[in-house]
Amino acid sequence: MSTFTAACVQITSRTDVHDNLKVTTDLIRQAVDAGADFIATPEVTNLLEPNKAAAQEKAQLQDDDITLAAFREIAAETGKWLLAGSLVIKKPDDDRLTNRSFLIGPDGAIVAQYDKIHMFDVELQNGESHKESRAYAPGDKAVLADTVWGPFGLSICYDVRFSHLYQQLALAGARVMTVPAAFTETTGQAHWHILLRARAIENGAFVIAPAQCGQHSEKRRTYGHSLIIDPWGEILAEAGDEPGIILAEIDLDQVAKRRQQIPNLKNHRDFDLVVPDSIATAAE
């Protein structure tokens, strides 16, 4: 198969897992009815809880997570591919949580899972700060997933700022990159479109980026603007700043076409870095 219809589900997750699940599954079913073959939800779909202790209490182990179970049931019922962009999952051997993405096949089986590698630890100019590593344990493995349409590269949100991750996924065969996210309104306005289009262009790959949107709590507001981008960097579909769905046709023949026109993956070369002693000494 060289073509399929992709959908992004855009939501405003808050602190009630059951409410979040109801809203998300309703939108997933809307995407199914609209003809989507592959449906992706945002980062932290099941829970966006700013309080670490409360998040620990509400999060569940993977085998017990009600959102994951519901998504698997929907995938099996509808025969669609479903990406749970990420779920907040409790670790059995750690007091930190896991920010984990799940790719679910049309039979309801988990095809692949990916733990977010790069933690969002930032201090922004407006006084806004985030320290994801306080509550979450980072992953240490990049994941390439096998689908009926070929390899997908999995990532989550802040990962998008680390271009080498996507280059390695593309070199390993990824033609589609998934970037579920919960970008803040501040960073989203400044960087969201630029970063995602850059990842698509430099790797000649489709990018599917479902996003959180709106006001989640007193101090947390996300940008929205879920995007589906082609290998030339053109935006095929874009959401606004409210919950909903977007859809776009994915023609994977475009990947080979763009990579032939600009073969930067083929032209990639390793290199040595020459650092003068004066600079090396100053850095120590």
Q: What is the predicted role of each segment?
A:
Residues P92-A172, E185-I194, Q261-N264:
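Active-site catalytic loop in hydrolytic enzyme cores
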Residues A84-S86, R100-L103, V143-A145, S226-I228, ...:
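Short beta-strand scaffold segments in enzyme catalytic cores
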Residues V17, T25-D107, Q113, F183-R199:
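Cys-nucleophile CN-hydrolase/nitrilase-fold catalytic domain and related Cys-dependent amidase chemistry
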Residues D19-R29, R161-Q167:
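Short, acidic/polar
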Residues T15, T45-L48, H118-F120, Q254:
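Feature marks short, surface-exposed loop/turn motifs that line or immediately flank catalytic pockets
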Residues D253-E284:
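A short C-terminal boundary segment appended to hydrolase-like catalytic domains
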Residues Q62-A84, P151, C157-I246:
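CN hydrolase (nitrilase-like) catalytic-core segments centered on the catalytic cysteine
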Residues T3-T15, A40, R100, Q113, ...:
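Active-site-proximal beta-strand elements of phosphoester/diester hydrolases
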